[in-house]
Amino acid sequence: GIGPYVPHKETPFAKMKQGTVRQTLVMISLLRLMFPKALIPSTTSLGTIAADGRERGFMHGANVVMPNLSPVSVRKKYELYDNKICTGEESAQCRGCLDRRAEAFGFQIVVDRGDY
């Protein structure tokens, strides 16, 4: 992925400096310029460190969102970093939330194949 580094408290990297929204948006922008047809995600980690992070990722060239579709009962077992967003929502709730947020920025979520 192309998200910011977000430390997890139970890893050897727990005290490492977290990545920033700005660094991530610059990288997304550069990738979009270099690879116009690439599938570039606006990651959950970007949305975790900034409330509008995923939306800003799209505004800087990202074109993929990766919702958490794992059953709520097992999501804690896949906790890559602390304070991850959307861990308490059911898959359908997450999809509805993503749709509303995308529409607010003039985007539409599709579930088609992403290749060209």
In which residue ranges do the predicted regions lie?
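Auxiliary Fe-S-binding modules of radical SAM enzymes
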Residues: G1-Y116
